[in-house]
A protein has these predicted regions:
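Glycine-rich phosphate-binding loops that contact phosphosugars or nucleotide phosphates
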Residues: 53-184
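Cofactor-/ligand-binding subdomain signature composed of acidic, glycine-rich
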Residues: 1-53, 172-184
Length: 184
């Protein structure tokens, strides 16, 4: 098979097999992600309404590394949509000083983006929010239904996991399908 005029042998020789496949598969994964979102739209909206229907609230977008950039990329569009109540912080900023980034009293939606959903910073930001916030909800957007964040959602009513399809859980070092699908 040839992708972008590279044979499998050429991709393997350049150690780029996963990256090239993951770039190439993106349009197909985007369609699946859009269908997945459409299928859970009502359930997700009901979950979000627990926070966004409050008079005052915060939405905090977070992640580590490239996953943080998903939140940073969405920040401006979402901040305007939600009357300037959206913030974006690296999970590595939340974990050591959650009082500096999270409101104790406002209803807060912590949106955690994570390819694996297993990073210590992702799990740590959830744990810190549970301690600091009186009214916290968690939306986990991950590419791994077996990850720690997804498993937390199974155990807690204040959590919602949006686990993207398995092929978005990139194997390459570069986050391609995972980044673009978490952004969607």
């Amino acid at each position: 098979m040839s992708i972008f005029n590279y044979t499998e042998e050429q991709m393997a020789a350049a150690s780029s097999t996963f990256t090239i496949h993951e770039i190439y598969q993106q349009p197909a994964t985007w369609r699946k992600t859009c269908a997945q979102l459409a299928a859970c739209k009502d359930e997700l909206q009901k979950f979000l309404d627990q926070v966004v229907k409050a008079e005052d609230f915060d939405i905090v977008l977070t992640g580590a590394g490239t996953s943080e950039f998903v939140g940073n990329s969405l920040y401006h569009a979402l901040n305007k949509k939600y009357n300037f109540k959206v913030k974006s912080y690296a999970s590595t900023d939340i974990v050591p000083n959650p009082e500096d980034t999270l409101s104790r009293t406002k209803p807060t939606l912590l949106v955690n983006f994570g390819r694996s959903g297993n990073s210590p910073e992702s799990v740590g930001s959830v744990e810190a929010a549970e301690v600091v916030c009186e009214n916290i909800y968690h939306l986990f957007v991950t590419c791994n239904s077996e990850g720690a964040l997804s498993k937390l959602a199974d155990k807690h009513d204040n959590c919602f996991a949006l686990n993207l399809t398995p092929e978005t859980h990139d194997k390459s070092f570069a986050m391609t399908s995972s980044y673009s699908n978490m952004y969607l």
